[in-house]
């Protein structure tokens, strides 16, 4: 009986984490914006882009800029 309560508690914790929006099933097949930036030859910066580079997108869920 104690084992079933432990399993139920674990399942509830897992489902509550998944309800936050960024769960495992919606994340399948999606790459992070940081990965896409670096793969395309850019770099993620929190400050302004250096001279002779342009903003190509965002990184870290919109908190930084992808400079290329």
Swiss-Prot record:
Disulphide connectivity of cysteines: 37-66, 44-59, 49-67
Any one biological process term the GO annotation gives: defense response to Gram-positive bacterium
Organism superkingdom: Eukaryota
Principal location class: secreted
Subunit comment: Monomer. Homodimer.
Role played: Has bactericidal activity. May act as a ligand for C-C chemokine receptor CCR6. Positively regulates the sperm motility and bactericidal activity in a CCR6-dependent manner. Binds to CCR6 and triggers Ca2+ mobilization in the sperm which is important for its motility.
UniProt family annotation: Belongs to the beta-defensin family.
Name assigned to this protein: Beta-defensin 1
Organism of this sequence: Hylobates lar (Lar gibbon)
Encoding gene, per UniProt annotation: DEFB1
């Amino acid at each position: 009986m104690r084992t079933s309560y432990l399993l139920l508690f674990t399942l509830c914790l897992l489902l509550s984490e998944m309800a936050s929006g960024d769960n495992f099933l919606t994340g399948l097949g999606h790459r992070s914006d940081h990965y896409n930036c670096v793969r395309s030859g850019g770099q993620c910066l929190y400050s302004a882009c250096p001279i002779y580079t342009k903003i190509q997108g965002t990184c870290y869920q919109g908190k930084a800029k992808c400079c290329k």
